[in-house]
A protein has these predicted regions:
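Solvent-exposed, non-transmembrane loop/terminal regulatory segments of multi-pass membrane proteins
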Residues: 1-24, 141-150
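Extracytoplasmic/secreted envelope proteins and their assembly/folding machinery
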Residues: 7, 11, 32-36, 180, ...
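Active-site lining segments that contact anionic ligands and/or coordinate catalytic metals
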Residues: 17-19, 36, 45, 157-162
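Short beta-strand segments enriched in hydrophobic/aromatic residues
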Residues: 24-26, 167
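Short, conserved charged micro-motifs
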Residues: 29-37, 171-178
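Short amphipathic beta-strand/extended segments in non-transmembrane regions
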Residues: 33-66
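Charged, amphipathic alpha-helical linkers/stalks
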Residues: 60-108
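Extracytoplasmic
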Residues: 111-187
Length: 187
């Protein structure tokens, strides 16, 4: 059969992958990170990809919670501007104690801060002159926002996060099905 021969030729040239999607409730980034690490440890898993291991820059991943100083260093934004963003984020979520206490110890996941920042930009606060960003900073933020949106589009919906596993197993067979049972127990 021509189709089988073509598939075999493709597999011989490019290799074959057995990709599996794991869907979990969204929002608990720390649990997702632990699960990805646990899944990656299995010898049957070549790679595991989820929001909690998508690198943004300088070793940080999308779900890392950063202080204003860390966010400032990541984005090359002025520290005072980052403090303002963190205060606005806290106020938006009615976490006023964060504003009154030391905002410098408040940590927000990168993905959440960027979504808030772009909502903030979209609402026109930057354009109204409350906060001014230079062109380079604005360009860097646009690039990071694109990365984040691409990852989120592929790996998260409103209620669920998707993790993609590339397995070092055939698509079917006893070993594969036994490993799927193991995955069900772990997840």
């Amino acid at each position: 059969n021509e189709t089988e021969i073509a598939r075999e030729n493709i597999d011989n040239v490019f290799g074959s992958q057995n990709t599996l999607a794991v869907v979990v409730p969204a929002g608990d980034y720390e649990t997702e990170e632990r699960l990805l690490k646990r899944l990656s440890a299995f010898p049957q898993v070549d790679t595991a990809l989820g929001l909690a291991n998508v690198e943004v820059k300088d070793g940080y991943v999308l779900t890392d919670a950063l202080t204003p100083r860390q966010f400032s260093e990541l984005t090359d934004m002025d520290m005072e501007i980052c403090r303002l963003f963190y205060k606005a984020y806290a106020a938006d979520r009615e976490e006023y104690v964060r504003i009154i206490n030391n905002i410098d110890v408040f940590k927000v996941p990168i993905i959440d801060m960027f979504q808030f920042l772009y909502q903030y930009v979209g609402d026109g606060y930057l354009d109204q002159g409350y906060i001014t960003l230079d062109d380079d900073t604005r360009s860097d933020l646009d690039d990071l926002n694109k990365q984040i949106n691409d990852a989120k589009e592929q790996l998260q919906s409103e209620k669920y996060s998707r993790m993609l596993l590339n397995l070092a197993l055939p698509e079917e067979g006893q070993e594969t099905f036994a490993f799927l049972d193991t995955l069900h127990e772990v997840i």
